[in-house]
Amino acid sequence: MVRGWEPPPGLDCAISEGHKSEGTMPPNKEASGLSSSPAGLICLPPISEELQLVWTQAAQTSELDSNEHLLKTFSYFPYPSLADIALLCLRYGLQMEKVKTWFMAQRLRCGISWSSEEIEETRARVVYRRDQLHFKSLLSFTHHAGRPPEEVPPPPVPAPEQVGIGIGPPTLSKPTQTKGLKVEPEEPSQMPPLPQSHQKLKESLMTPGSGAFPYQSDFWQHLQSSGLSKEQAGRGPNQSHGIGTASWNHSTTVPQPQARDKPPPIALIASSCKEESASSVTPSSSSTSSSFQVLANGATAASKPLQPLGCVPQSVSPSEQALPPHLEPAWPQGLRHNSVPGRVGPTEYLSPDMQRQRKTKRKTKEQLAILKSFFLQCQWARREDYQKLEQITGLPRPEIIQWFGDTRYALKHGQLKWFRDNAVPGAPSFQDPAIPTPPPSTRSLNERAETPPLPIPPPPPDIQPLERYWAAHQQLRETDIPQLSQASRLSTQQVLDWFDSRLPQPAEVVVCLDEEEEEEEEELPEDDEEEEEEEEEDDDDDDDDVIIQD
């Protein structure tokens, strides 16, 4: 367990995690009283550029190590959201700041350092499998810290490039043998001894099949059934070495004893990846040393999102296979599609329902003809009809039910031209499901099951019976309408329309409503003429009078 590290005097603490370096970062308020003795402090990296470095006491980062709820949450996803952290604190009575600090310390121990884009993309990948723990093997690193100090001497502190903290490593007194991962100060007297109960709890967590983590017992049973050795399980598929691995290998080149009787600290293996892992791993001196190298690659192997059990490993592109071990890219393997186009397609993250919809094949002409022929007779199929249609067409029942629903919707809104052209005479345009009409589907479906599935179109209407009736009677009687409709294969309304078209056109009669006004207008000119004649006669009389006076 990383208890803390002692920064050399005179050096400025800086962060080199892909963010901007900060110069001379003072400790926070909690650490202000311990500035004279910085051995018990630990520097936690920020998550974004806006956050400052977090200095906290190393003892606070290990208070919650025995909380199974936090361990399970970290095993599911090492970057929980604020909502998840708040829910944990509310449900189990924890303090928000301590929980956030604990998660940052766990990520630092496991060497997980992702950018914000990688966090969001990886969260989107694992959101479809909420019932599985995708990172259940990461915390097995920290469980080695519960062993007594005499079993695990302090290994060398990594260089600044590996941990991401820009502080030079302290000088090493002598190379030591490493059985597990434990980073301690050089003087054991500075650190208080762990309680015995805490050590026993740690040891019980590390034993395979212990009751604290039941999912690990299933994992070891799967290892025994698959036939892989624990050493092969400790190195996982496509184990890669990061940029700063050379310094780790240089400091841990002392021969180490075989530790096959102990479980490996990390198990990066999936059930369907055993052939690839057996052929792609590189031989190592022991399972502990190989897992120690995996932890040394802080941003490579430990930061990879573990593939869930049952997954299929992606094939490595030739450009990545050609890279030497110390130049392999240091980002999670599942997120390399940004640099390798076409590596990870969007179809890998689709839900099973969406993938099933994409695999739906188009219906053939024969299948559509069978469905349309049945729909012309009955728009609401029964369970037996669906079974028959499923046998005849070969289509799955959900597709048949969906086709009937879509076709009924289109018919209700007047969008089915083929239904209007081929509708059965006398049948309603849209059948109400509440009206129980005996569908003629049982007999026809039984016949189609024995004969070829090609339907027979209905015969065209025949007008000759109507013409013979018109030539004989020249008039339509109401009692003869059903017989004529059956003989001509026309509906009752169509028969009536045909006879109406045969009737002679009635004579046009023009009715003028203004006749009285026209008569009055004709009388008025006659009166005017009579008045003019009377005036002329009066004028003649006046002339005669004048002549008489002369």
Swiss-Prot record:
The modification Phosphothreonine is found at residue 451. Ubiquitous. Strongly expressed in adult testis and kidney as well as fetal lung and kidney. Residues 55-114, 355-415, 451-510 bind DNA. The modification Phosphoserine is found at residue 351. There is a cross-link at residues 182, 200, 202 (Glycyl lysine isopeptide (Lys-Gly) (interchain with G-Cter in SUMO2)). CDD domains: homeodomain. Residues 1-36, 168-199, 223-265, 424-465, 512-550 are annotated as: Disordered. It comes from the Eukaryota. A motif (Nuclear localization signal) lies at residues 358-363. The keyword 4Fe-4S does not apply. GO terms for molecular function: DNA binding; DNA-binding transcription factor activity, RNA polymerase II-specific. Residues 237-256 have a biased composition (Polar residues). The keyword Calcium does not apply. It is found in: Nucleus. InterPro entries: HD (IPR001356), Homeodomain-like_sf (IPR009057), Homez_homeobox_dom (IPR024578). Homodimer or heterodimer (Potential). Interacts with HOXC8. May function as a transcriptional regulator. This is Homeobox and leucine zipper protein Homez. The gene is HOMEZ.
